Amino acid sequence: MSCVGKLPIIIPEGVKVGLNDLEVKISGPKGELSKSFKGSIGISLAENKLLVKPLSSSKSARAMWGTARSIISNMVTGVKEGFKLKLEINGVGYRAMMKGKYLNLMLAKSHNTKIEIPSHIKVEVPKQNIIILEGTDKEKLGQFASIIIKQRPPEPYKGKGIKFEDQFIPCKEGKKN
């Protein structure tokens, strides 16, 4: 029995859910999301609750049970409230700025890095070293954040690079003579 999968997903006011065979469509004040699931998961709507159940007792169906429930729960939260990620840039001369629909990063390379911002993600740069990402889809928001971090991941000796705001980077000790 899945500890996560057996919990019902409560649908808040202002959020509409549509079920078509293996596809779930959820719409709310912040937007609309849809996701298809394999045939091993059954999704039912009763009153204001969504229930996810495995259709068989196979190992893959049980594994997808809790995962599917978490994905649907994140979709409901996303269309109701949205998700927000803060990235922090550390390093001398490291900066970020917006230029149209591009995020321009200056990260001590021979050239500036331009990253195109997807249409479903809103990006703000309140300071040169802070990037705020907002969106309804938690998965796509995290993927875009990882694309930005990959441009200059935090290094363990001085802590320079791009990281999540609340992320701790353990610093190593330098060479001893």
Swiss-Prot record:
SUPFAM superfamilies: Ribosomal protein L6
Leader peptide range in chain numbering: none
GO cellular component: ribonucleoprotein complex; ribosome
InterPro entries the UniProt entry points to: Ribosomal_uL6-like, Ribosomal_uL6-like_a/b-dom_sf, Ribosomal_uL6_a/b-dom, Ribosomal_uL6_bac-type, Ribosomal_uL6_CS
Subunit structure comment from the entry: Part of the 50S ribosomal subunit.
Gene3D superfamilies documented for this protein: Ribosomal protein L6, alpha-beta domain (3.90.930.12)
Source organism: Rickettsia bellii (strain OSU 85-389)
Keywords carried by this UniProt record: Ribonucleoprotein, Ribosomal protein, RNA-binding, rRNA-binding
Biological function: This protein binds to the 23S rRNA, and is important in its secondary structure. It is located near the subunit interface in the base of the L7/L12 stalk, and near the tRNA binding site of the peptidyltransferase center.
GO molecular function: rRNA binding; structural constituent of ribosome
Coiled-coil boundaries: none
Name the record gives this protein: Large ribosomal subunit protein uL6
GO biological process: cytoplasmic translation
Keyword RNA-binding among UniProt keywords: yes
Keyword Ribosomal protein included in the entry's annotation: yes
Family affiliation: Belongs to the universal ribosomal protein uL6 family.
